Amino acid sequence: MIGTMNTADKSLIQMDLALRRRFSFTEMPARPEFLAGVTAFGVDVEKLLTRINQRIEALLDSEHTIGHAYFMPLKKLENNADREACLASIFQSKIIPLLREYFFDDYERIGWVLNDSVKAKENRFILLQQSAQLPSFSALFPKEIADSLSDRRFRINDNAFASAEAYQGIVA
């Protein structure tokens, strides 16, 4: 029997301890090389995953690197448009939510992992919301609190998922 478990998942600690007593474990690190030759949006997916994982390891640790399995559906797709749609879906429904969990919704750090700071605003996955769209801190809090806060309200840029430059910027 083969079972898999993400070592970063601490919510199942009792189950983890029980399994560790009963089974032997083999570490299965991410293997971006399994994605060699796969491209989408003009980006080598092996390099994309490698760069993302290098940044995650620098900011967190190797236990949080993203596995190649998330990207394996791309391998069976022949059509570039299908691969692009699949990669967008992987990022939107798997990678971004996973990064949100890893970084406790610290969107600034998520942006660092995705190298958003070097991209044009429209190609960033994470955007700082415009203050004009939101109530000011002075409208929300007493002056002494409002004056001490830095506006760090972020949002996901849904348009980036269909942007080649958004993915190309990750490996830049």
Where are the language model's segments positioned?
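C-terminal regulatory/interaction module of P-loop NTP-utilizing enzymes
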Residues: 1-172
